[in-house]
Amino acid sequence: MLPPHVANAHQKGDIHFHDLDYSPYTPMTNCCLIDFKGMLANGFKIGNAEVESPKSIQTATAQISQIIANVASSQYGGCTADRIDEFLAPYAKLNYKKHLADAKEWVAEEKREDYARAKTRKDIYDAMQSLEYEINTLFTSNGQTPFTSLGFGLGTSWFEREIQKAILQVRILGLGSEHRTAIFPKLIFTLKRGLNLEPSSPNYDIKQLALECATKRMYPDVLSYDKVIELTGSFKAPMGCRSFLQGWKDENGVEVNSGRMNLGVVTLNLPRIALESKGDQDKFWEIFEERMGIAKDALVYRVERVKEATPANAPILYQYGAFGQRLGKFDNVDQLFKHRRATVSLGYIGLYEVASVFYGSDWETNLEAKAFTLNIVKAMKNACEGWSDEYDYHFSVYSTPSESLTDRFCRLDTEKFGVVTDITDKEYYTNSFHYDVRKNPTPFEKLEFEKAYPEAGATGGFIHYCEYPVLQQNPKALEAVWDFAYDRVGYLGTNTPIDKCYKCDFEGDFTPTERGFMCPNCGNTDPKTVDVVKRTCGYLGNPQARPMVKGRHKEISARVKHMNGSTIKYEGKHL
């Protein structure tokens, strides 16, 4: 079904046409920001069930879980509930009004408000805990847990603050009797100057709770409110793990984020172009232009295929509000995509390897080398802007997560070029613009180095992360990095040792093995009695329960800490 030259380029490893098990066989979309606010306010339909607007926060979160399950079965990428604290607050307020009415009948007047707040606080906590359990026990039509993210942190009312606190408290507690770390939903907390960033700001206490949560559970990742606006044109959480919409206004001049979507990704194998050019930069740019032409054709094909959908293919998306509008059964779905409402993404991998071909493996402090890599990002951005003008869809530059692609491209290039030192010999390619994981700059040096790449045009998808020792006794160290990052990067993740062995009670960093990870104290590798949590890239993963591809395992094993300190919280018992 793919154009022959696109299929050939994919099979050879020049490009990667993502999610071929779903697209183009089906006209599915990739990821989205679900319009929960509109769906909860106006009701929706799933199957034969007409669902009306909820009358409590418990019912609202139950409806959210059903929407997530249905949306995740109707697309192949992740979905995000952006600003969940704000859109759930009206339903928490309904709980409060009910409890206040009860209090007027049974509680002394001076205690009524305290009673209503205490009952509402418990309702909020229970609702958010139920949502966390629901998401972790849901399965989509393809048998996976939905890739879900919750964006929160900007609310200022009592209800919004309580929802923020409950999300973090539930995650800190953990899942089940063993209090395991929840992998889903991904938590994305927004930092904002004047709101929660500084000690004098009104929501600073919630930032402290977010720091505690990140030291114990790695999530939440954090968004820098002002930097996200600077990079993308408006504030919003990413769709799924890292895909960002650009700022966009409808025909009435109203800014719209929720209800928008991404139509798919095609990724360029940049290290291959560098290897093929044999150190000749003119040759590099010549091959680059040719591959960009193939990528363009692949992306245009993605758009054309998705446009062939009918609302009846995915009623939850097109007819019942997930995509922000309610189309008739026979309406043209393209009205939700065109005029740049939807994005389609040009991905890339391996800027580290590209520069290593031309400048050697320790090029990060070489200004000429860095300028070369930035010119690659700028060239992709300029091409995407031209394609956007030509086709009226928003083509964006996307820093591909490469969960498995890091392995595939490197493996294919090893077959073609052999074992090349610092490039294919590692058995993985470095994600997007990231600093070589084998090196140990400080967190500040790493972020200072990486910040230029989204600024150069990689705004359709990006994330930065730093590797830390155990931080639970030192949250101020993490706060220092968050504060430093605020004006520099838009999106930051925390990687810290939180593995646990339930046989000997060891807590800290498990030891990588050829097949997975092992408790360094007792040697336990049984996924039933260990909880190993690693950042696959954008999302966290349980590699002991669900092993990852060899290349990604090699990359995780090669990571070094960017800060000194112990990687062990508790050494464990001697068995």
Say what each PLM segment does.
Residues 344-357, 378, 535:
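Contiguous, well-ordered alpha-helical segments that form the cores/surfaces of helical PPI scaffolds
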Residues 82, 271, 344, 535-538, ...:
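Flexible, active-site-adjacent loop/turn segments at secondary-structure boundaries
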Residues 122-132, 356-357, 549-557:
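Metallocofactor- and cofactor-centric catalytic cores in central/energy metabolism, strongly enriched
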Residues 1-340, 361-362, 366-528, 532:
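Conserved catalytic cores of very large enzyme subunits
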Residues 523-574:
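Long insertion/accessory domains within large nucleic-acid-processing enzymes
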